[in-house]
Amino acid sequence: NFKKFGDMITTDDIKPLEINDGYAKRYDGIANLDAKKDGGESIISIFSALKRLFPMKVDMMEKHPLGSQAFIPMKETTFLAFVAPEGDKPDLNKVEAFIIPNGIGVNYNAGIWHFPLIATHALLKSLLSL
């Protein structure tokens, strides 16, 4: 269950708000961005990741203790997420792996250990909120 690590970013099960005279739909509340640092701010970047070679070794993890981090693919593609609970160091015995399906993004909670983005196709281009 990914919920203990953050949000799955999807429009599934969310009723859209029709806007712009019916030419667009807005899906609210798909993820909670968090900037815990006093005076902190969230930024949006474009992140481009090359396909990883498999098999691969998960031999390091990173975390962002001051705020959440979201990856939202700009085209439909799958990617992998390796995550572990908060703590001073990642507990490699508690690492969980997720296949993130087409059309879904993720938002890691602040302090969640994760391996850098793992593209499963030639190129994964995503919006990054940090």
Segments predicted by a language model, with ranges:
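Non-catalytic, conserved peripheral segments adjacent to functional cores
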Residues: 1-97, 121, 130
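A short beta-strand-loop micro-motif that forms or neighbors metal/cofactor-
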Residues: 112-130
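Short hydrophobic/aromatic-rich beta-strand segments that constitute the beta-sheet cores
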Residues: 80-81, 107, 115, 128
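Conserved metal-binding segment of the jelly-roll/cupin
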Residues: 99-113
